[in-house]
């Protein structure tokens, strides 16, 4: 059975996912500060916009003005898509306070009320016809109330998947923490992608690993990655080998690299996806 997929078009990411993200999945982007989680989420949205997939960005930790500026930093012009009604920012940061915030169309007044957030998000998705959603950072919603984490994630997931969207939830973890955002969160999402920034012999190494992804095969090794002027690039045909306190970047076995490359080619040959059936009411 062929699994419908959403291509990220992030260099190297579709390869390590053997073709892309299964449609309607909610994927946790987990990692410490400075690892590139927010960049990856925005790159996923912008790559979709360029190819006709409308998108919604939920800002929980940044002012909408700062969000737009961070897109522009990489040359990602979202202004035209906002004007055309194909992209929207849900302001769950300001609570509607301030003159700049008052110009926003989608505002969550009670930023810790997940039901209000769900209602505003639902409206933004319907208005734009969004296929892609990014929430940055979902950790903000339950940081002081870990007991409600799973319920929060499931509430948002029902709205997003029910409206036919595929989503990235950015999740903050402390430096050196091995988890991904808590057991309630980790089991509720469909996929987990971990981004890391580690020091070896005085040098920082960026890496990415797919920890889980339902309905698809995925790479089982840690891949090196870089943040360049145009966004994130993953060295999908290489992996990081750690021995003691040293690190080496090695090429993947040829058969593994070939299988990843072929999987992406096969997805590219598939016919354009049909209109997604909306189930959520």
UniProtKB/Swiss-Prot annotation:
UniProt keyword Cytoplasm, yes or no: no
Name of the protein in question: UPF0273 protein PAE3143
Signal peptide: none
PANTHER family referenced in this protein's UniProt entry, alphabetically: UPF0273 PROTEIN TM_0370 (PTHR43637:SF1)
A Pfam family the protein falls into: ATPase
SUPFAM superfamilies: P-loop containing nucleoside triphosphate hydrolases
Family that this chain belongs to: Belongs to the UPF0273 family.
HAMAP family: UPF0273
């Amino acid at each position: 059975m062929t699994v419908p997929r959403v291509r990220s078009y992030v260099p190297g990411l579709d390869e390590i996912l053997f073709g892309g993200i299964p449609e309607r999945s909610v994927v946790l982007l987990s990692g410490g500060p400075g690892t590139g989680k927010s960049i990856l989420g925005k790159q996923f949205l912008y790559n979709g916009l360029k190819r006709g997939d409308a998108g919604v960005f939920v800002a929980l930790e940044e002012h909408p003005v700062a969000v737009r500026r961070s897109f522009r930093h990489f040359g990602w012009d979202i202004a035209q898509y906002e004007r055309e009604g194909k992209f929207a920012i849900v302001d769950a940061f300001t609570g509607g306070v301030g003159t700049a915030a008052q110009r926003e169309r989608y505002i969550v007044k009670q930023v810790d009320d997940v039901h209000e957030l769900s209602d505003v998000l639902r409206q933004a998705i319907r208005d734009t016809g969004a296929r892609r959603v990014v929430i940055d950072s979902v950790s903000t919603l339950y940081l002081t109330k870990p007991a409600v984490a799973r319920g929060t994630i499931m509430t948002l997931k029902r709205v997003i998947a029910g409206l036919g969207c595929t989503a990235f939830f950015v999740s903050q973890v402390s430096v050196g923490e091995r988890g991904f955002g808590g057991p309630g969160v980790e089991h509720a999402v469909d996929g987990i992608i971990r981004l890391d920034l580690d020091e070896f012999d005085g040098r920082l190494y960026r890496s990415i690993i797919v920890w889980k992804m339902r309905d698809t095969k995925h790479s089982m090794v840690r891949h090196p990655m870089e943040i360049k002027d145009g966004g994130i690039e993953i060295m999908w045909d290489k992996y990081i080998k750690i021995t003691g306190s040293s690190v080496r970047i090695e090429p993947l076995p040829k058969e593994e690299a070939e299988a990843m490359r072929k999987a992406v080619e096969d997805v590219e040959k598939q016919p354009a996806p049909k209109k997604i059936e909306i189930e959520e009411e």
